């Protein structure tokens, strides 16, 4: 091993910490408006529940807790996400250090996560629940590998925490610990680590963490799973064979989308030595191979027997996030010299660390030149500021959760309901005036949406009030481009 490979790897974590601080700054500088998942967190922070709908509640619980101390703000949202991502990378690096001797490969494996588009770009853009899955998977994977190599009460406890958090992050997380269990049981040398009394602690911790949500899930199974199943099985009137073909092809495309850039980067960095390295192996590469095979087999079962027709690349995060580490284990097993590879890898990482924040900011700011607007260009705060000059609302009914969450961060002391989410329905009988706000589709009707009119009639016995329209300049708007909102008042004073 070269001298450069022996040096301490703490610089990796310092670099990542600086990167995620930069991401917080870029997010705050880009726009005050919230995207879909951010708005969902702001909206649902008005109440604490054992379950909220199609997504398990881990991220909601975490964000609710932070909001109680820090207030509802974009800053709190961005810090929570990037702190979770930093901890995930940190745990991934610690896991790599457990199984890799070459410190250069530890660095490449850890920073290699940035070569996965779903990890580096999509998680910054939105996808809060996928961030929670990655965080949970990193905890579990560290606890699992440590339990196999350096078993202790703490390692089994960490694995249990990871499983508990993961099941509260996304239901498909269950495939990961199942794959790990089957993969370890199939190796006689690792089997004693599974038939260990401390595994009972793992199961107990996971059960305690998930128990409140499991009680809720028992009574709300259809509500919790209907939307996900609808997405997975959206094959129209296709025949069974067509549905299976759609599912398998979508899985193949998802794998390519997830892994292609990482494979390309490793091919560039290691050159001709990569291909023979992929034929090498160790007990750790064989373990990871079995885990990935079991995970993919589980998804294939969902396709063949569960009717899944559309597999999304982000659904592969609980397993395929191990790819950079897997490649590095292969390379170490082949005895490839890594000093030059690390020097070639660092510029790639630098391009990603600069390019991703620039792309995130540019996708919104470029609207002033292109006229193409994202959700973050919408001027929710400007609209609310104008309407509050007409009257101070005692409560707000928004047309959807995206709008409700954006309003919530600017007027946190007022109950905000959403017409598309019946789970939060406080008594508004004595709260007047009530402000109704909705998004106006291009070329659509300016009248009060039917679902909001139905809500008023069902909950307040009130007929639809007169609707008005307000238009507000976009963030980074081109020329005089403006975004239009519909609004109405119920019992406006004066």
UniProtKB/Swiss-Prot annotation:
EC number: 2.4.1.-
Keywords: Cell inner membrane, Cell membrane, Glycosyltransferase, Lipopolysaccharide biosynthesis, Membrane, Transferase, Transmembrane, Transmembrane helix
Cellular component annotations (GO), alphabetically ordered: plasma membrane
Biochemical pathway: Bacterial outer membrane biogenesis; LPS core biosynthesis
Gene Ontology biological process: lipopolysaccharide biosynthetic process; lipopolysaccharide core region biosynthetic process
Mode of membrane association: Multi-pass membrane protein
Phenotype of null mutants: Cells lacking this gene produce a normal lipid A structure with GalA at the 4'-position but a modified LPS core structure as this gene deletion results in addition of GalA to the 4- but not the 5-position of the outer Kdo and nearly complete addition of GalA to the Man residue. The mutant cells are also more susceptible to deoxycholic acid when compared with the parent strain, and more resistant to the polycationic antimicrobial peptide PmxB.
Coiled coil residues, start to end: none
Official protein name in the record: Lipopolysaccharide core galacturonosyltransferase RgtB
């Amino acid at each position: 091993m070269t001298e450069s490979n022996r040096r301490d790897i703490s610089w990796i974590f310092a670099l990542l910490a600086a990167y995620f601080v930069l991401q917080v700054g870029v997010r705050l500088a880009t726009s005050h408006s919230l995207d879909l998942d951010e708005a969902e967190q702001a909206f649902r922070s008005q109440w604490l529940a054992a379950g909220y709908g199609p997504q398990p509640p881990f991220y909601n619980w975490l964000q609710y807790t932070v909001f109680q101390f820090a207030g509802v703000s974009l800053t709190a949202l961005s810090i929570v996400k990037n702190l979770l991502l930093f901890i995930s990378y940190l745990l991934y690096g610690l896991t790599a250090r457990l199984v890799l001797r070459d410190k250069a490969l530890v660095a490449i494996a850890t920073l290699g996560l940035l070569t996965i588009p779903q990890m580096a770009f999509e998680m910054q853009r939105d996808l809060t629940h996928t961030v929670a899955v990655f965080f949970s998977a990193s905890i579990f994977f560290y606890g699992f590998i440590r339990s196999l190599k350096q078993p202790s009460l703490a390692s089994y406890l960490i694995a249990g925490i990871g499983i508990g958090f993961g099941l509260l992050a996304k239901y498909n997380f269950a495939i990961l610990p199942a794959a790990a269990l089957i993969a370890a049981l199939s190796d006689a040398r690792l089997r004693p680590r599974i038939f260990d009394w401390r595994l009972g602690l793992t199961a107990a911790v996971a059960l305690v963490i998930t128990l409140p949500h499991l009680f809720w899930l028992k009574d709300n199974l259809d509500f919790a799973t209907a939307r996900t199943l609808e997405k997975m099985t959206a094959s129209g009137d296709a025949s069974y064979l067509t549905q299976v073909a759609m599912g398998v092809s979508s899985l193949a495309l998802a794998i390519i989308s997830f892994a292609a850039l990482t494979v390309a980067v490793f091919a560039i960095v290691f050159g001709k030595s990569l291909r023979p390295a992929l034929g090498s192996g160790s007990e750790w590469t064989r373990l990871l191979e079995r885990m990935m095979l079991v995970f993919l087999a589980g998804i294939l079962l969902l396709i063949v027997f569960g009717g899944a027709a559309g597999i999304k690349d982000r659904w592969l995060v609980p397993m395929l996030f191990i790819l950079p580490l897997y490649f590095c284990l292969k390379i170490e097993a082949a005895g490839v010299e890594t000093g030059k590879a690390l020097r070639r890898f660092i510029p790639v990482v630098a391009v990603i660390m600069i390019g991703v924040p620039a792309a995130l900011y540019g996708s919104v700011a470029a609207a002033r030149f292109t006229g193409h607007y994202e959700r973050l260009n919408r001027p929710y705060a400007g609209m609310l500021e104008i309407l509050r000059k007409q009257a101070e609302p005692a409560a707000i009914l928004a047309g959807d959760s995206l709008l409700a969450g954006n309003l919530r961060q600017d007027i946190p002391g007022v109950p905000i309901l959403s017409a598309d989410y019946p789970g939060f329905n406080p008594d508004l009988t004595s709260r007047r005036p009530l402000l109704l706000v909705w998004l106006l589709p291009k070329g659509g009707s300016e009248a009060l949406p039917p679902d909001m009119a139905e809500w008023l009639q069902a909950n307040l016995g009130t007929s639809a009030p007169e609707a008005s329209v307000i238009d507000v300049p976009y963030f980074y708007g081109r020329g005089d481009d403006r975004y239009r909102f519909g609004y109405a008042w119920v019992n406006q004073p004066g």
